[in-house]
């Protein structure tokens, strides 16, 4: 860390902002418990990944430039999403091959951008959390977090410190859920088959709750589980680690009361 209390900017992500703000609050709570000074830059916008994956490099570049400008001056940038963090860390610099100034700025941003749980364990050295959840969970490894950022052991390490919780592994935790951002729109039949297979694996564990670190995956799997009449609850891993499962109903369910 660069100082006793690193200054961390939270990249909220579009899906957290629009569908699950509790995840953002959970991320702030965890980061503050880890000793960070947390700020949420108000001018932040989409990371540009949907445009990038669709081949729209012009709009992806424009969005990336906005993000680069909004997140200057922080020690670290942290996102509760391996997908968005991976976009910034691995794809931004190449967007500015024709712009040396922004190429340098984007490389600097990429070097200090992290997925939330891996930042907590690998950068600030968090060993355990002060949370409790009675029951069993299973964990889905989101593609970008796993393959671009190496996020696998980190969430399991912290989940194993949650009192009352047991973690049951999927038979194939690394298999894609079929979301893939715009993939599920471009190839809906393939996406449905993939998420159906994934949900079969989830239900076979007997776990009461499904966790993951990316809202896109969670929304996709929650929707399929609900259509199949499953009672499995679906949550972002940050909500469990922060002890905030009472603050919002499971994904896809209405809050009672």
Show which residues each predicted segment covers.
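Iron-sulfur cluster-binding electron-transfer modules in prokaryotic oxidoreductases
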Residues: 1-257
């Amino acid at each position: 860390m660069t100082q006793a209390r690193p200054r961390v900017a939270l990249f909220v992500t579009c899906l957290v902002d629009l569908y699950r703000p509790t995840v953002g609050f959970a991320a702030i709570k965890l980061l503050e418990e880890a000793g960070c000074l947390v700020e949420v830059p108000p001018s932040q916008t989409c990371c540009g990944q949907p445009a990038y994956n669709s081949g729209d490099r012009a709009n992806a570049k424009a969005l990336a430039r906005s993000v680069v400008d909004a997140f200057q001056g922080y020690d670290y940038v942290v996102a509760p999403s391996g997908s968005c963090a991976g976009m910034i860390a691995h794809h931004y610099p190449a967007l500015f091959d024709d712009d040396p100034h922004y190429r340098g700025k984007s490389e600097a941003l990429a070097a200090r951008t992290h997925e939330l749980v891996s930042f907590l364990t690998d950068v600030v050295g968090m060993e355990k959390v002060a949370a409790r959840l009675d029951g069993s969970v299973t964990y889905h490894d989101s593609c970008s977090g796993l393959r671009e950022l190496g996020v696998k052991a980190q969430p399991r390490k912290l989940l194993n410190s949650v009192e009352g919780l047991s973690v049951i592994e999927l038979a194939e935790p690394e298999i894609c859920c079929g979301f893939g951002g715009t993939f599920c729109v471009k190839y809906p039949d393939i996406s449905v088959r993939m998420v159906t297979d994934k949900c079969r694996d989830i239900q076979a564990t007997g776990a009461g709750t499904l966790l993951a670190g990316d809202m896109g995956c969670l929304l996709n799997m929650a929707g399929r589980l609900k259509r199949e009449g499953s009672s499995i609850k679906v949550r972002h891993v940050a909500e469990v680690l922060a002890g905030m499962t009472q603050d919002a109903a499971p994904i896809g369910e209405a809050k009672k009361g």
